[in-house]
């Protein structure tokens, strides 16, 4: 299974929903990076994703996007293939 990295922030309902969706898809561990605790992490997230909002989700080296993008990927049947290439 690919490594899952998620940039998150505090009190973020979309972050919580993304974690639940990923766990339901069989992801046992998510590398969570809190951008509120580190300006460097926020800058890194922006550089890698081009976005300023959380969550930003990466599966392996692939930038999935935010929760809506992850949900759409799951609904279209592409999440499992990305997690288990």
Curated annotation (Swiss-Prot):
Domain Glutaredoxin, first and last residues per copy: 1-85
Subunit structure: Monomer.
Molecular function GO labels: electron transfer activity
One Pfam family named in its UniProt record: Glutaredoxin
GO BP terms in the entry: cell redox homeostasis
PROSITE patterns xref list: GLUTAREDOXIN_1 (PS00195), GLUTAREDOXIN_2 (PS51354)
Protein family per UniProt: Belongs to the glutaredoxin family.
Top-level taxon of the source organism: Bacteria
Disulfide bonds: 12-15
Keyword Nucleotidyltransferase attached: no
Keywords for this protein: Cytoplasm, Disulfide bond, Electron transport, Redox-active center, Transport
Purpose of the protein: Has a glutathione-disulfide oxidoreductase activity in the presence of NADPH and glutathione reductase. Reduces low molecular weight disulfides and proteins.
Protein name: Glutaredoxin
Subcellular location: Cytoplasm
CDD domains, per database record: GRX_GRXb_1_3_like (cd03418)
GO CC aspect terms: cytoplasm
